[in-house]
Amino acid sequence: MMLQQVADALATHWLSGILAIATVYLATSYIIDYRRLRAFPGPPLGSFSYLWLAYNALQGRQGSIFYEVMKRYRVPEHSFVRIGPNDLMTDSPEVVRHMSSARSTYLRSSWYRTSKLDPSGDSLLSIMDTAHHDALKAKAGRGYAGRDNRNLESDIDDQLRRLIGLLERKYLSGGGDASSFRPVDMATTMQYFTLDSITKLAYSSAFGFLDLDTDVYGYIKAIRDAAPPIIVCSEWPLAGRIFFSPPFLKMFGPTPKDKSGVGKLMGTLRQVVASRFGPDAKDQPDMLGSFVRNGLSQHQCEQEVILQIVAGSDTTATALRGTLLQLCSTPMVYLKLQKEIDEAVRSGMVGEGVISQETARKLPYLQAVIYEGLRLNPPFTGALMKEVPPGGDEIDGVFIPAGVRIGVSAKGIQMRQDVYGHDVDVFRPERWTECDEQRRMRMAANTELVFGYGRWMCAGKNVAFMELNKVYFELLRRFDFQVVDTKTPVKEESFNVMFSKDMFMKVTKRVL
């Protein structure tokens, strides 16, 4: 009995000691973290805890929250707001270029760890080592940009014709009677188009989202369900180290044997990759074929194919549906663009087929709509945190210690009054046609930061612009769109990309 009491007492003292040491360690860490970035204003909770980032990551307003915190706490002296114990945020285009230039020594931070869904390897997005990233991008970049695909434009045209066919087949509305009213959720339909486009470009065969008019493999739902915890783990380093560690992913992550969702898609894509490396493999003029020709191994291709889907569909869909909604909500802009489209058709500038990218670039108001739409609907709203290199860095006259993560407010960069004027909240394509060429080029360079910059620029930027140039022209050429519910035109959540649904529109056929 006496020995048991002694043992219990020792156990209690050991436990108390461990808790005391842990408490002192955590308190000391918080004090050190607080002091090293105390010069930067920000939400008080964020200065010593990741709870502020974690809570706001789950609100579904990520892009707007980052913009609002920059507006509230940003000071004239520098371009940074503190959002975490070791984390800053900026809305400065100059800082973004500084961190991302080809010669920059900034690193990818732990934020990128959560883009890894397969524990067996890294993709171009999740790879942390800069030299390895650059070497991989040199091999895969031509494929992502579509430069090795001689059928790039015709493949996109084919999927656009399928989108038009779906609207004509199922969703054209007639008069006012109930039987002829067929509203379509254009938010979902736009994503079907981008998904089929990227799978056609990547593997020479679209997965059939448009033909089936359904979420093939439950991909969209799976990505939406996974987004909130992924964001929490990307912004909270400890959570990322735990839940995106190889052992955890092996036990709980998606696998190619899954019956639905991302895992099912992984399994399908691995079969596609395997067919390019088997004894009967044939070279194909698509993204995957480019990867193989440029020396990527079968395992490396398996890592890249899932990235192709996410990076090539969710992002562009955000810009497409957001801009379409703004067009429908701004009649003067809608009619002005439609007038330019009609004149291009009547003049013979555009034939009966899908407009070419070369011709689309010659239409000034269409280009203004594209850039204004990108500005107000950034395809990616995540923080994309970079890490300050060894030795620290001095920016705007303030020193930032090594190892600090710096995130980017995509919306903040696109709402800068010193770049776009005082009416930045307004969808006004005229700002692009009324200014001189020097100002237009400055605005364009700022807007194109939605695709990243320098070393970290999105390799698929060219493909995205090709889709944007064609979709607005062809849809407004053939149809009229009317928002069904003007009070709640769309349901949106921002989790790195914008997840949109229930953007119901009435579609009627135009006769030129």
UniProtKB/Swiss-Prot annotation:
The chain crosses the membrane at residues 13-32. One of its GO terms (cellular component) is membrane. GO terms for biological process: abscisic acid biosynthetic process. The keyword Chaperone does not apply. This is Cytochrome P450 monooxygenase ABA1. Pathway: Hormone biosynthesis. It comes from the Eukaryota. Its EC number is 1.-.-.-. GO terms for molecular function: heme binding; iron ion binding; metal ion binding; monooxygenase activity; oxidoreductase activity; oxidoreductase activity, acting on paired donors, with incorporation or reduction of molecular oxygen. Keywords: Heme, Iron, Membrane, Metal-binding, Monooxygenase, Oxidoreductase, Transmembrane, Transmembrane helix, Virulence. Induction: Expression is up-regulated in spores. It comes from Pyricularia oryzae (strain 70-15 / ATCC MYA-4617 / FGSC 8958). Pfam families: p450. CDD domains: CYP57A1-like. Heme binds at residue 458. Disulfide bonds: none annotated.
